Amino acid sequence: MPWSEVSPGHFQRPLGANEKFIKSIGDRAHPLGREHWSVTAQARFKTSDALQGGQERVPELHKAWKTMRFAHPSIASIANAETLDYYVPSPDGLEDWMQQTFFVVEEDTSSQQYIASLQPSPYLTAHYLVRTSELILHTAHWRTDGFGAMQLVNAFFEAFAGLDDRDPIDLPWGQEVARLVPSIEEVLDLPEEATPEIKAATAECMATLALTRGAVGVSYQGDLTTLPAGTHSVQGRLSQSETKAIEEACCTRGISLLSAVHASVAATTYAGASSEAKSKPYTSTMRFNLRPYVPEPYSSPAYASALYTGGYMVQVPATHSWTENVREYNSAYRRGLSKGFLRARREYALNVQELLKKNIAMDGPPPSEVDISSIDDAELLVRPVYHGKSGDVEILDVSIGVETLTRQLYCFVWTFRGQLGFNLVYNEAYYNLTTATVLLDTLKNVLLTELGIRDDRAI
């Protein structure tokens, strides 16, 4: 159902089934002051001499933030139990929203430390770290995904570089509602009632969830009673020469870079597993950006603040070699998503919601594998340089991640400015920095070694 005006300046639509099930997962951690799978996108930047730096640039950043809301109003929508609500702001309302959502951080803290302290918000929030010149966007996962979050980073810097003398208050507020995003169910024109074909496709997707049981996992701290703490991460980048060598090696072998990293993530999980677990199969997620599968204009960056993602679980046996795994992953990525998978998006989400309500306890240890998520070439999402009337804005590096409250680790991967980047996300209640660093070093070493770029296996 599309957005409708339920009272003057108040627009509303039902939460989509996928938004609702992702929201229910995130909301479970609210009593702990956290939100599972909340998305965090980062960009470190510098400006030319013509633009102000440090604390002096804050008023301009505020203007850019308000301008960005006009272009992407769904960053200010609020999710209730059954509906999404958006209110056209008055001048005072726009200022109040800015004060609630844009934060200037002057403390001497790293982005990783700061992200670990973030708490849930009804809105998408922005955080400017003055000392390191970093922008962090943080939001619940029901609002967007990794690709969309990076497109929103791009939208912010487009607004910042493109500022003029006009006050954002003077924009034609009320017209922005035409850009409120629809749900994936509406975009794909999915029926309310599932057909037999849709039910069959849903059953196939649901069946893959069982693959997480009895799978190999990384050894973790604590026991089943250990409560989660903050989310931390360890980041790394390969040099431009190493990245180029990896891309050339993948091209020669007829495989994608993502497939090679995925196989290396599997090997990393086995390396971090206990000796008793090393004979178990490895289960991970085949994640897909749905934007290439939806019609125009919904595939464009104008719909960045939308949850357009999907996936299913896959499993490889412990007896498989790296080469066998990379071939299997490459085939799956190349195959992409079927029409049946897309048509099952609503029914699948409804089925998962029902499963979550039952709160069925899993047999055996909880999943603790390293899983993978990729935004591919980040330069297709975030421009390296923005040219404006007052000067240029250069993006030095980017990163993407999520909050995790489970024993699962998530390896995010991308390329930017010719470098392959990694962000390994973990919960500090179950892993420490040393363990995470060793895992990421192992991943990089496996990737370089298996592709013949590094001859030894020393980290």
From Swiss-Prot:
Matching SUPFAM superfamilies: CoA-dependent acyltransferases
Family: Belongs to the trichothecene O-acetyltransferase family.
Enzyme nomenclature, EC number: 2.3.1.-
Classification via PANTHER family: CHROMOSOME 7, WHOLE GENOME SHOTGUN SEQUENCE-RELATED, CONDENSATION DOMAIN-CONTAINING PROTEIN
Biotech use, per record: As colorants, MonAzPs are widely used in various food products for centuries. Moreover, MonAzPs also possess wide-ranging biological activities such as antibacterial activity, preventing hypertension, lowering cholesterol levels, causing hypolipidemic effects, and displaying antiobesity and antitumor activities.
InterPro entries: CAT-like_dom_sf
Transmembrane portions of the chain: none
Keywords linked to the UniProt accession: Pigment, Transferase
Entry function: Acetyltransferase; part of the gene cluster that mediates the biosynthesis of azaphilone pigments (MonAzPs), a complex mixture of compounds with a common azaphilone skeleton very widely used as food colorants. PigM and pigO are involved in the elimination of the omega-1 alcohol with pigM acting as an O-acetyltransferase that synthesizes the O-11 acetyl intermediate whereas pigO eliminates acetic acid to yield an intermediate with a C10(11) double bond.
Official protein name in the record: Acetyltransferase pigO
UniProt organism field: Monascus ruber
Induction line: Expression is positively regulated by the azaphilone pigments (MonAzPs) gene cluster-specific transcription regulator pigB.
Keyword Transferase on entry: yes
Transferase found in the keyword field: yes
UniProt note: phenotype after gene disruption: Produces the angular tricyclic shunt intermediates monasfluol A and monasfluol B that retain the omega-1 alcohol.
Region forming the signal peptide: none
Pathway: Secondary metabolite biosynthesis
MF-aspect GO terms: pigment binding; transferase activity
